[in-house]
Swiss-Prot record:
It comes from Pyrococcus furiosus (strain ATCC 43587 / DSM 3638 / JCM 8422 / Vc1). Belongs to the QueC family. Catalyzes the ATP-dependent conversion of 7-carboxy-7-deazaguanine (CDG) to 7-cyano-7-deazaguanine (preQ(0)). Zn(2+) binds at residues 195, 210, 213, 216. It catalyses: 7-carboxy-7-deazaguanine + NH4(+) + ATP = 7-cyano-7-deazaguanine + ADP + phosphate + H2O + H(+). This is 7-cyano-7-deazaguanine synthase. Gene3D superfamilies: HUPs. GO terms for molecular function: ATP binding; ligase activity, forming carbon-nitrogen bonds; zinc ion binding. It comes from the Archaea. ATP binds at residues 9-19. The gene is queC. HAMAP family: QueC (MF_01633). Its EC number is 6.3.4.20. Pathway: Purine metabolism; 7-cyano-7-deazaguanine biosynthesis.
Length: 240
């Protein structure tokens, strides 16, 4: 029986690692990128198109206007306003990290995205939803936790006609571990985008990261500490 997977692809290190991992594990892989009006949407779509061609994987981009509207109601800085700037030291402060997480929170995003992926897989006959949830982000984003995955899979038993489950291959890893996995998989991570406020692309197609948002700092710190290098292009090199 053919093993099928849908990779929820947001363009960053986590989903890029998941994509390369899934390509080795499954017979059929589909990338699913969801647009909801975020600041980095244009860059995310181009990154998704790049990896779709690079790995010869089918890409589906879904637009969810209602999620943009709900995010605007909530006042999420990911769809408007200024994204918080943080330092590596501030990321170690749970209160400060939680404050930043609240600023960029998209209402029930992961639940909504997984529902979309589950619907697609149910229509195709079932399969696995591959998500980039990891131990580091689970400390500030509860919808990245192992418990969340377990509860989702309990619900999916009742929600789909065909068997669908969530698989989180990075669930025990921090950014350093993810960096090491990317290197093992020979992933072209420099073409991925983690930035909440990207500045466009280089001539060879690499996203230009702001270097100041939480996601940029986590990315740079993880790569340097994990594999001793960072090929990412930054407008301002993050201070770690």
């Amino acid at each position: 029986m053919k093993r099928r997977a849908v990779v929820l692809f947001s363009g960053g290190l986590d989903s890029t690692a998941c994509l390369y991992w899934a390509k080795k594990q499954y017979d059929e892989v589909i990338m699913l990128t969801v647009n909801y009006g975020s600041n980095e949407e244009r860059v995310t779509n181009k990154v998704a198109e790049y990896f779709s061609k690079e790995l010869d994987v089918r890409l589906k981009i879904v637009k969810l206007d209602f999620l943009k509207e709900f995010s605007e109601i909530r006042g999420s800085s990911l769809v408007g306003g200024e994204v918080p700037r943080v330092t590596a030291e501030e990321l170690e402060d749970i209160e400060k990290a939680s404050e930043t997480a609240r600023s960029v929170w998209i209402p029930a995003r992961n639940l909504v995205l997984i529902s979309v992926a589950a619907s697609l897989l149910d229509a195709l006959g079932g399969g696995d939803i591959i998500v980039g949830f990891n131990a580091e982000e689970a400390t500030t984003f509860p919808d990245n936790s192992r418990e969340f995955v377990e509860k989702l899979n309990e619900a999916l038993r009742f929600a789909t006609l065909n068997p669908v489950k969530v698989v989180a291959p990075l669930i025990d890893l921090d950014k350093r571990g993810i960096a090491k996995l990317l290197k093992e998989l020979n992933a072209k991570y420099e073409y991925s985008n983690s930035c909440y406020n990207p500045k466009g692309f280089t001539e060879d197609g690499r996203p230009i990261h702001c270097g100041e948002c939480e996601s940029c700092v986590r990315r740079h710190k993880g790569l340097i500490e994990g594999i001793g290098e960072d090929k990412t292009v930054y407008a301002i090199t993050p201070r770690i």
